[in-house]
């Protein structure tokens, strides 16, 4: 039995029993806590938990899912796959245990000729929660199974909850016995390999309390409405019904496996276990990547895009290990498309886009593999030869930095060779690289051409910084640099670097951005674009000559933009305060790893490995603003380095220290750091700290961003305006806005679900009218009709299948056309008798699509075509009738 046929039988079975057929949701979940849709129940969670009233009492679906938690197990077991389809039937306060169990047993054991799945009852076993006597008795009565074939298991396997207070309940699982060749007797409680779980029935009937783990929680009582949530693994049933060994060999996956084996010249199943695993990885990952890209995911270095990129790269490497070093995606992805398009036509309509994404990713990564694999192989061999078990961190860094080899791939390949990787050394080298990148950025800012130019000017003496105590300093021009070379003068319109004997302008350092301002002198005005320290002790001012002419040796007065400096001081002192607050809340392990501040804005990176909760963010913000309200004194002093360390001053800005360092105290010892930046005199001068963002900047670092001073007040004013407008528009007091908006969102989602259900019912309401339009072409019943305008091709497909199945066992063909998504689409469905008479849906769909100005095709029982000419729909339907005979 083909996978698509099992899919169809599932939906038909439950549709005939009053369930609303709900199309699969996207793999990209609406739930912000999930990267992907990971289970069939995910789209129904609001209904199952009671957050939103269900728009229907019963529902059924076949849901696309992605799980990559066990990605390393793919190909090694018969059951692990990254993409899978979960068949589900759901009851929202309607039927409960008895009906759910009866439905399951009926569908599984009804003969294939009567629309069931045709499992022999003697091959089926059942597990129930050990204390659920009700379920055990129902199974005994409904199935007639012997007592020993209904096994009671504990909470860890047969009790469902969300892991937190809320709905919970026992579950019952149905297993298929593959026979003694696969393991020992004794049922599912004894051996997982022999007994394959195919269906899980969850009986949501209780309210659970606080607790940890799978079984350490209290049951508080019954739920007011009892729900049913079941899941049957489509791929698992398919491999059992198709008589193959695992899910990689079913009709939707095996074609890719065979094509990969053909490309590699290594037949599948020839006892070469490692090669078979790699072929299964290719088959699984190609299908998963194709489905992800069809649902809009694109390769990237973070989030969903990174998961996709990893799947694609693992596929490339698996083919590489099979001996194929050329591009294979152009041969593999069309095969997967053809295997999946009958169930998901969007796979074909989106293929031009998705295939180009895949092919480009493969081309890029092949270059990486060519360069990096030989180096890694050599390093692994040398490590093993030396009797070591850990690959050096500098090797992993070289692969990452020079060849673009992702660290997760290095870890994976090293593990395959029985080695670990010195991750700590790798992380240190990455941190050093970031520091060098920062230095390179500084070099670009100062337009470095030859350090000797700066060194020569440095020989004249260090630049004296006066900006701690004044915003205006008189000095003289010691040197000029234009395009990296010394110059005697700069004229109006030129960009130059100016070296002064003394300056009030702060050069970028310690995370603080450079000051803005001007330099003026006799007959000239210079706008300061940037201020840097190209060599130790020398300050370079990058300027635009606004007017006049400036030459070496002339007097010069540096003028700091007072407003900018005020904002910069607020931000830098605010950084120290937030850092102290972070450590107060999170502990001493949360220490600063980087920062950047400029007028009105700061960001602070700190060592921490998980996101901060909203409550933690609020606490940090409150402690910070409390320090501002206390108007703490800010003092600076210069001390010997050893004395500063003895006082507990923290070294943060990553520069090499001299014997004497500058210590900044805020509120005495409350905050004490080594710092060369500019600061307010008292904390109240900061005004306000407004934490606006918290995010990840690596596996062990987080980043907070904040507005300070005037910018913080401006941001709050904008928020206040927005809140006021919302309050007015929604006629709701502002303190009730969150609840009101949540209610509106819930109502909107409920309305959308009701619309979907209404549209599905509206489609099915057309069935009787179409049945009355049946005609005959020879011995074949024919329904060829224009269905008007529908939301999606899925609606048209459901309508065609339903009409076909209602036409009975005599030869029947249904051809329906409609405008779906603004384009003409035709669906052709044939029953077995029509196919026996030589009428195939694929050929008819291709005929109709040709008239519509497009293309089409599919399988003998169900096919789709489309085009661009909607006016040709009548002619296309006529062509189908003519082609039948």
Curated annotation (Swiss-Prot):
It is found in: Cytoplasm. It catalyses: tRNA(Ala) + L-alanine + ATP = L-alanyl-tRNA(Ala) + AMP + diphosphate. Its cofactor is Zn(2+). One of its GO terms (biological process) is alanyl-tRNA aminoacylation. Keywords: Aminoacyl-tRNA synthetase, ATP-binding, Cytoplasm, Ligase, Metal-binding, Nucleotide-binding, Protein biosynthesis, RNA-binding, tRNA-binding, Zinc. Binds 1 zinc ion per subunit. It holds the Pfam family DHHA1. It is an enzyme of class 6 (ligase). Its EC number is 6.1.1.7. One of its GO terms (molecular function) is alanine-tRNA ligase activity. The keyword Protein transport does not apply. SUPFAM superfamilies: Class II aaRS and biotin synthetases (SSF55681), Putative anticodon-binding domain of alanyl-tRNA synthetase (AlaRS) (SSF101353), ThrRS/AlaRS common domain (SSF55186), Translation proteins (SSF50447). GO terms for cellular component: cytosol. Zn(2+) binds at residues 572, 576, 675, 679. InterPro entries: aa-tRNA-synth_II/BPL/LPL (IPR045864), Ala-tRNA-lgiase_IIc (IPR002318), Ala-tRNA-ligase_IIc_anticod-bd (IPR018162), Ala-tRNA-synth_IIc_core (IPR018165), Ala-tRNA-synth_IIc_N (IPR018164), Ala-tRNA_ligase (IPR050058), Ala_tRNA_ligase_euk/bac (IPR023033), DHHA1_dom (IPR003156). Catalyzes the attachment of alanine to tRNA(Ala) in a two-step reaction: alanine is first activated by ATP to form Ala-AMP and then transferred to the acceptor end of tRNA(Ala). Also edits incorrectly charged Ser-tRNA(Ala) and Gly-tRNA(Ala) via its editing domain. Belongs to the class-II aminoacyl-tRNA synthetase family. Consists of three domains; the N-terminal catalytic domain, the editing domain and the C-terminal C-Ala domain. The editing domain removes incorrectly charged amino acids, while the C-Ala domain, along with tRNA(Ala), serves as a bridge to cooperatively bring together the editing and aminoacylation centers thus stimulating deacylation of misacylated tRNAs. This is Alanine--tRNA ligase. It comes from Leifsonia xyli subsp. xyli (strain CTCB07).
């Amino acid at each position: 039995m083909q996978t698509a046929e099992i899919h169809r039988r599932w939906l038909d079975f439950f549709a005939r029993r009053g369930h609303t057929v709900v199309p699969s949701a996207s793999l990209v979940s609406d739930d912000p806590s999930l990267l992907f849709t990971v289970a069939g129940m995910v789209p129904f969670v609001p209904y199952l938990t009671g957050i939103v009233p269900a728009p229907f009492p019963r529902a059924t679906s076949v849901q696309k899912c992605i799980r990559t938690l066990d990605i390393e197990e793919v190909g090694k077991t018969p059951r692990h796959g990254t993409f899978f389809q979960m068949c589900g039937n759901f009851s929202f306060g309607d039927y409960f245990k008895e009906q759910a169990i009866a439905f399951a047993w009926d569908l599984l054991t009804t003969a294939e000729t009567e629309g069931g799945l045709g499992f022999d009852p003697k091959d089926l076993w059942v597990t129930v929660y050990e204390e659920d006597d009700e379920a055990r008795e129902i199974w005994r009565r409904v199935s007639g199974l012997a007592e020993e074939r209904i096994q009671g298991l504990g909470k860890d396997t047969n009790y469902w909850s969300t892991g937190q207070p809320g709905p919970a309940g026992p579950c019952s699982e149905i297993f298929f016995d593959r026979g003694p060749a696969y393991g020992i007797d004794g049922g599912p409680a004894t051996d997982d390999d022999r007994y394959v779980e195919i269906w899980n029935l969850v009986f949501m009937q209780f309210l659970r309390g606080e607790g940890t783990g799978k079984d350490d929680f209290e049951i508080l009582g019954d739920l007011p409405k009892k729900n049913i949530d079941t899941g049957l693994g489509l791929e698992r049933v398919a491999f059992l019904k198709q008589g193959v060994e695992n899910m990689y060999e079913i009709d939707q996956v095996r074609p890719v496996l065979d094509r990969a084996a053909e490309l590699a010249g290594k037949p599948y199943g020839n006892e070469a276990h490692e090669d078979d695993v790699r072929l299964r990885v290719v088959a699984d990952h190609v299908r998963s990547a194709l489905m992800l890209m069809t649902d809009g995911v694109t390769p990237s270095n973070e989030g969903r895009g990174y998961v996709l990129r990893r799947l694609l790269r693992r596929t490339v490497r698996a083919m590489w290990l099979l001996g194929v070093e050329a591009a294979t995606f152009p041969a593999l992805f069309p095969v997967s498309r053809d295997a999946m398009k009958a169930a998901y036509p969007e796979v074909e309509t989106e293929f031009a886009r998705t295939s180009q994404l895949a092919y480009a990713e493969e081309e890029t990564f092949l270059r990486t593999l060519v360069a990096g694999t030989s180096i890694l192989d050599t390093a692994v061999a040398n490590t093993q030869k030396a009797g070591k078990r850990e690959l050096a961190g500098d090797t992993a860094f070289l692969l990452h930095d020079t060849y673009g080899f992702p660290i997760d791939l290095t870890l994976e390949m090293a593990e395959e060779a029985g080695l670990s990787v010195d991750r700590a050394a790798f992380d240190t080298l990455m941190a050093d690289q970031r520091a060098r990148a920062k230095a390179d950025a500084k070099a670009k800012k100062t337009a470095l051409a030859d350090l000797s130019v700066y060194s020569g000017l440095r020989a004249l003496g260090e630049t004296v910084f006066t900006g701690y105590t004044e915003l205006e300093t008189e000095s003289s021009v010691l040197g000029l640099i234009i395009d990296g070379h010394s110059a005697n003068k700069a004229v109006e319109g030129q960009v130059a670097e100016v070296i002064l004997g003394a300056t009030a302008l702060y050069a970028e350092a310690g995370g603080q951005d450079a000051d803005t301002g001007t330099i003026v002198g006799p007959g000239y005005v210079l706008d300061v674009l940037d201020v840097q320290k190209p060599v130790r002790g020398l300050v370079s001012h990058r300027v635009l000559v606004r007017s006049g002419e400036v030459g070496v040796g002339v007097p010069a007065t540096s003028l700091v933009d007072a407003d900018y400096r005020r904002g910069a001081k607020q931000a830098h002192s605010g950084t120290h305060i937030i850092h102290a607050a972070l450590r107060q809340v999170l502990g001493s392990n949360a220490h600063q790893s980087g920062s950047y501040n400029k007028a009105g804005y700061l960001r602070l990176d700190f060592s921490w490995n998980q996101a901060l909760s909203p409550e933690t963010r609020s606490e940090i913000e409150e402690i910070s603003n409390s320090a501002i309200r206390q108007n703490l004194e800010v003092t600076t002093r210069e001390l010997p380095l050893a004395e500063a360390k003895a006082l507990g001053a923290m070294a943060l800005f990553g520069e090499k220290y001299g014997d004497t360092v500058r210590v900044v105290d805020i509120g005495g010892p409350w905050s004490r750091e080594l710092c060369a930046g500019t600061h307010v005199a008292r904390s109240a001068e900061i005004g306000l700290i407004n934490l606006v963002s918290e995010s990840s900047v690596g596996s062990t670092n987080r980043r907070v961003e904040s507005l300070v001073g005037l910018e913080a007040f401006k941001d709050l004013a904008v928020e206040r305006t927005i809140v006021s407008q919302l309050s007015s528009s929604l006629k709701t007091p502002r303190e009730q806005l969150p609840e009101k908006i949540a209610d509106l969102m819930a109502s909107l989602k409920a309305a959308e679900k009701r619309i979907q259900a209404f549209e599905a019912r509206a489609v099915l309401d057309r069935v009787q009218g179409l049945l009355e339009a049946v005609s005959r072409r020879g011995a074949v019943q024919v329904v060829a009709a224009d269905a008007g305008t529908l939301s999606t091709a899925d609606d048209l497909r459901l309508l065609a299948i339903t009409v076909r199945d209602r036409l009975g066992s005599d030869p029947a063909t249904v051809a329906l056309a409609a405008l779906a998504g603004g384009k003409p689409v035709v669906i052709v469905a044939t029953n077995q008798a029509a196919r026996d008479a030589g009428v195939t849906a694929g050929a008819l769909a291709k005929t109709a699509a040709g008239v519509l100005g497009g293309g089409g095709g599919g399988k003998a029982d169900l096919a789709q075509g489309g085009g661009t000419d909607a006016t040709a729909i009548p002619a296309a339907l006529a062509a189908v009738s003519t082609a039948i005979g």
